[in-house]
Amino acid sequence: MEVTEANLQLLAGYLQQTLSADPNVRRPAEKLLESTELQQNYPILLLNLIDKAQMDMTTRVAGAIAFKNYIKRNWAAHLDSDGPDRIHESDRNTIKTLIVTLMLHSPVALQKQLSDAVSIIGKYDFPKKWPQLIDEMVERFASGDFNVINGVLQTAHSLFKRYRYEFKSQALWEEIKFVLDRMAKPLTDLLQAKMQLTKVHENNAGALKVIYGSLVLVNKVFFSLNSQDLPEFFEDNINTWMGAFIQQLAADVPSLRTADDEDAGVLEHLRAQVCENICLYAKKYDEEFKPFMEQFVTAVWELLVKTSLHTKYDSLVSHALQFLSVVADRQHYQSIFENPEILAQICDKVVIPNLDIRPSDEEIFEDSPEEYIRRDIEGSDIDTRRRAACDLVKTLSINFEQKIFGIFGQYLERLLTKYKENPATNWRSKDTAIYLVTSWASRGGTQKHGITQTSELVPLPEFCAQQIIPELERPNINEFPVLKAAAIKYVMVFRSILGPQVLASCLPQLIRHLPAESSVVHSYAACSVEKILSMRDASNAIVFGPQILAPYTTELISGLFATLSLPGSGENEYVMKAIMRSFSVLQSAAMPFMGVALPRLTEILTQVAKNPSRPQFNHYLFETLALCIKIVCHADSSAVSSFEEALFPVFQGILQQDIVEFMPYVFQMLSVLLEMREGTGTIPEPYWALFPCLLSPALWDRTGNVTPLIRLISAFIKQGSAQIQALGKLSGILGIFQKMIASKANDHEGFYLLQNLLSYYPPAEIQTNLRQIFGLLFQRLSLSKTPKYLSGIIIFFSFYVIKFSGSQMAQLIDEIQPNLFGMLLDRVFITEMGKIPKEQDRKMVAVGVTKLLTETPEILQQQYATFWPRLLHSLIDLFERPPEKLMGLEIGETAGVAEDPDAGYQVAFAQLTHAQPNQQDHLAEIKDARQFLATSLSKFAQARAGEFSTLLSPLEPEYKQVLQKYCDQAGVRIA
């Protein structure tokens, strides 16, 4: 693809089409760009378009976003597999040559996207493959151009912010040191220069805005560079930085004050970041920070007292309160808070004002209920005043429990008295009281169980009976909706503390609130019902089973479905999750409702498929459908055809229209339906019409499709291998196997597919391909020997030995390369088999290795005989030692990195709990692998009496003792 004017115009046209609201215009353009992005010069063409000043800015921004997403998808894709690099080497070098300069002279809208692209490239290439990046950036500090400097700082922030969350490692330390050696001093010099410039330009509002914007970014970079450990340079220059932070907290620049009450200005952002920085130091480096502590506590306190309740200050106040919480939690700073007068002032001037619901919060409650819910019960309120005030209350009540009890008790009484005087006017006082009690009493808990540890001084069940239940019993469910929501949340949060009796009395009231007009109220009602129904007792039995639910079942199910018809709740995830949970608890007792529920669920699926926009709702919708299939088909297995009749048209529409968000779910649902048919005869024709499409390479390029597709293909193999053979599709399946085995992320799926082929496909045809299959396994072993792959290949070969024979395996392997079987034993089985983590896999390996030892003559041949005692030694280790924990060994486990917020977007695979595949134990007849070893060795010893003692002689005495123990337990002899 040449960089020509004609190609630039063509690319611009397609980018404009990707912005269309019409999917018939947008999707073809997206697909075309996706199909051309692997051509050489494609990214260079994009960069040229972004740099073209004459081009429409909307198109340039679309190009910048497309470039960033291209980098996300492709820059590191080859690291996952042994496939070719998707980006030509010359393009990589050109990108790294052009991008920094292009970013720095681009408008802000483009700069942000390009900066993100730099940080993604830097994550993989910096510093080893891109060492000049830092020097190139630091050089620009001397340019004197504020916008260029801010561009560099934005890039540094994007590049280094992963230091905040990555796990510690030697490689990470080395990278941070590389950065500090080049960046720490220039950053400190820049801080001092910018602080000086605030005085030089004190009468130039435009310049001050850019200068203070620079300081915000300087502080963000400082935070990232200090997140892992305290660098020596910053410790040596702590006075410079802390002095600047004090000045920044005190800075009051009239020209930078904003008239807007909602959006924070640059000063608010600056102070919030300062509070975040000093919070980090107070938490992690309190010894070095100690000399500055009182000065900062005073500065933050003064800032809090004079800061108004406007929304624009929320992040600042939140971080300031977090700082006070950290200080109050440190024993050697607690003297600051021990004075009862100071505690009373904190409660009066800081805690209560920030616990109160504000007009802006009420506005969000009414107009943006989803945002309110996210903040209030989903934990996205990390930067809200209420959350920070609650955390401060919790910290103070833990560390100064007796002193704070009296102070908070007085406030609580005052708030409740005020409410009683005039509920219609003073309902906000009770809302504050509920929040105060919640944060005051809470000591610890989990998302799954709610609050599980509380203060003994706060009588929660009594407060619930006197203050919460009366609110829920009010006849008008639409009265005081904010207060209703707070009361429902109280029940939900303290469900593990209140006990089954109290909850049983609350349950009908919660169900009664499902039709409430307020989205927040009926969402909270659904959410609390779901969480209460999820509760289990000490024996893991459901606390509220079908018998307890029986009086309310009709009202519950009809109420939940009716809620989905309320304005704004057509795709309410809490309601759909509650429907799922209700059916899960009811099981067969849900059958009377299926006649109404199933058509409604199918109708909802048809509607949401047109525009999938609520991932959580969609997930629980599919969960509910999968659960319904299991409940109904458990009662009547022939009902599967009714489900197929209802759902196939919808599924076919989803697949034909390439609705990528739903495909992983559709493949799981098809697997469930097909597995339900096992043993009932041939696979119906509609499945076979779909089968060739399942082998399409494009489907397998989407990571979210891989696991459910492997399961679906395996179901076809299990029930229809003869038909697959007749269709001549084995080569297509083997192509998928080859793709899976080449991938570090998906090699386990390749092994799973291969096991199914060997188990259910006609042996004669699969045997002709075995040499090629084994060759691919050894090729991957030599190219990329990851711990997960080693585990997979050991399990697979053990399975092969059990299914066929060790002799057949040894002969086939040695045909590929002489003595390769011995290398497999020596370098893979003997050294690695003890590291396999899962019990069922360890059993498979134990039985397979036992058969190698006792039923495989090849291992007794001269060139392999020395491996026999070593293999037995490793097998005993497998039995006697716990599995070693290995990075990235478990499927889905991430090796050594925290979740990466910059990872490229792809529809992920989300396993449906109610569509889990049945676990198959290939060795159900073998109850104890140790006894199987003992019995097998006993037979082997009898058959080869003279040979056996020679083979066993190199084994250490303690291992022989363990072996004797196995024999005693099995009641057999080996000597």
Curated annotation (Swiss-Prot):
Ranges for domain Importin N-terminal: 29-105
Record PROSITE patterns: IMPORTIN_B_NT (PS50166)
GO MF annotations, alphabetized: nuclear export signal receptor activity; small GTPase binding
A biological-process GO annotation: protein import into nucleus
SUPFAM superfamilies in the record: ARM repeat (SSF48371)
Chain segments annotated as transmembrane: none
Record flagged with keyword Cytoplasm: yes
Gene Ontology CC terms: cytosol; nuclear envelope; nucleoplasm
Disulfide bonds: none
Main subcellular localisation: cytoplasm
Record localization: Cytoplasm; Nucleus
Keywords (A to Z) from UniProt: Cytoplasm, Nucleus, Protein transport, Transport
Biological role stated in the UniProt entry: Export receptor for importin alpha. Mediates importin-alpha re-export from the nucleus to the cytoplasm after import substrates have been released into the nucleoplasm.
Subunit structure: Binds with high affinity to importin-alpha only in the presence of RanGTP.
Similarity-based family: Belongs to the XPO2/CSE1 family.
Name used for this protein in its record: Exportin-2
Organism: Drosophila melanogaster (Fruit fly)
